[in-house]
From Swiss-Prot:
Protein name: Putative gluconeogenesis factor
Annotated segments matching region Disordered: 1-27
Keyword terms, alphabetized: Cytoplasm
One GO term (biological process): regulation of cell shape
Native source organism of the sequence: Deinococcus radiodurans (strain ATCC 13939 / DSM 20539 / JCM 16871 / CCUG 27074 / LMG 4051 / NBRC 15346 / NCIMB 9279 / VKM B-1422 / R1)
InterPro entries per record: CofD (IPR002882), CofD-like_dom_sf (IPR038136), Gluconeogen_factor (IPR010119)
HAMAP family in UniProt: Gluconeogen_factor
Origin: domain of life: Bacteria
Length: 467
């Protein structure tokens, strides 16, 4: 049972100025003490150098003492000791105590000078000295995080990356680039490049700088030829043009943006997504799916041209991964298209890492109408050649008002109804919904994935549901 809430402060009472006066001056000291203590945290790689500094200082002092007494500086050392004698008081402040005080002052001066040199160097690199220990601790911690490969596109993938970057910097996002609408479609047609839109969203999600993220996502509202484009899309198009292709420009992009992790297109070859429908029709172009699929349904999707190649960096990341996450995102336009690239599908099939499918919260009008969770998993298995080891499904309830709004558009909640025993054994439940929306909460989703990775997966039971 939770504790009762604390009573509200008595605003009628005068403030305790004595306590305030005593607290304010100590706050900077407390913050400095906390920062100093953080330098001693495990894993920073700092304590070993502090220990080496202490040992070398002691050895150097002893060696210098030996040199002064046995070498040409002996007369000077004698004069120095005689001069210090005037500060000694026999029985009260002996000569050795004077030496200890001088030694402590010298050591403090040396440490102060080293600190100021470090602060000057940090300022020169653009790092605030006050936050240096926090940045170092964060980067060291994140560098030991899970090696995870995410596959997908759209808002779902960028949401996932926003949450994952607080747990690990060993992230590789493999992004579907078959979009042919909007700014991406215009740049793709004009420059014969892959669609950059979802790549831009992922770079913004992994950015350490909120200002840079806003800049990448800025969409021009005016200007001939610029209207409708985002700055990030234009940046990727510029680097692709300058380097002769997006594949060769990826390293430059990562160095410029300095994001946590890596973002790669599923292929650097412009491809068109083709849907084969149950009524025998074929639709070419992702942007046409939502309008032209109804009243039929998608049986399969494929790429034109077939068998595009994948980047070597993507295949290496899949081989080294400790977890492969599919989604969240549109089943037929974000997740499966990346799995249609033979090299990626083969690498995922052969990977010893668990494959986790993050199920959508709702069906998508015009794309997954009438499909159950079993249909989603079967579609992935059919295109990939491997069944996901785990299926992560939200057990949070969508607010009725939000649910009604989606139902008016033809979307329904995706549930476990009708699932077989095998699928039920793979499902893991967790509260994943962002309050007031029908979207995954980035932090909740990342925490659920980390729980799967950290130890034996925990099963959450849906209210009123039985296997």
């Amino acid at each position: 049972m939770s504790a009762p809430p604390a009573p509200p402060p008595d605003r009628s009472a005068p403030p305790d100025r004595t306590d305030s006066a005593q607290t304010e001056p100590t706050r900077p000291l407390v913050r400095r003490a906390r920062r100093a203590r953080m330098w001693l945290e495990p894993g920073l790689g700092v304590k070993r150098w502090i220990f080496l500094f202490v040992v070398c200082t002691f050895v150097g002092a002893v060696a210098f003492l030996h040199f002064t007494w046995t070498g040409p500086l002996h007369p000077l050392a004698t004069k120095w000791i005689l001069w210090l004698n005037q500060f000694a008081e026999p029985g009260v402040f002996p000569l050795y105590a004077v030496g200890m005080v001088v030694m402590a002052l010298a050591l403090a001066g040396a440490l102060y000078s080293i600190t100021m040199i470090s602060r000057a160097m940090l300022r020169g690199t653009g790092t605030a000295p006050e936050t240096a220990v926090n940045v170092l601790y964060e980067r060291k911690t994140l560098s030991r995080g899970m090696r995870v490969v995410t596959v997908g596109g759209g808002t779902g993938l960028s949401n996932l990356l926003t949450g994952l970057k607080t747990h690990s910097s060993n992230i590789t996002a493999v992004v579907t680039v078959a979009d042919d609408g909007g700014s991406s479609g215009r740049l793709r047609e004009a420059l014969d490049m892959v669609a950059p839109g979802d790549l831009t969203d992922c770079y913004a999600a992994l950015s350490e700088s909120p200002a840079l993220a806003r800049l990448l996502l800025h969409r021009f509202g005016r200007g001939e030829g610029l209207e409708g484009h985002t700055f990030g899309n234009l940046l990727l198009a510029t680097l692709s043009e300058e380097r002769g292709g997006l594949g060769t420009a990826m390293q430059d992009i990562h160095e410029i943006l300095k994001v946590r992790g890596r973002v790669y297109p599923a292929t650097t070859r412009p491809v068109t997504l083709v849907a084969e429908l149950a009524d025998g029709r074929t639709i070419r172009g992702e942007s046409r799916f939502a309008e032209q699929i109804r009243p039929s349904r998608i049986e399969r999707v494929r790429l034109e041209p077939e068998n595009p190649s994948a980047l070597t960096q993507v295949l290496e990341a899949v081989r080294d991964a400790e977890m492969i996450v599919l989604g969240p995102g549109s089943l037929f336009t974000s997740i499966i298209p990346a799995l249609l690239i033979p090299d990626i599908a083969r690498a995922v099939r052969e990977s010893p890492a668990p494959v986790v499918y993050v199920a959508s919260l709702m069906t998508e009008p015009g794309e997954t109408d009438g499909l159950s969770l079993s249909d989603h998993v079967n579609a992935i298995t059919r295109h990939l050649g491997r069944t996901p080891d785990w299926v992560l499904l939200s057990n949070s309830k969508i607010e009725p008002a939000v649910q009604r709004r989606y139902q008016q558009e033809g979307a329904t909640v995706l549930t476990l109804d009708g699932a077989g025993r095998d699928l039920r054994g793979r499902v893991r439940f967790a509260p994943l919904i962002q309050a007031g929306t029908a979207r995954h909460d980035p932090q909740k989703l990342a925490a659920a994935l980390m729980q799967l990775w950290d130890g034996p997966p925990r099963r959450f039971s849906l209210p009123g549901q039985r296997d």
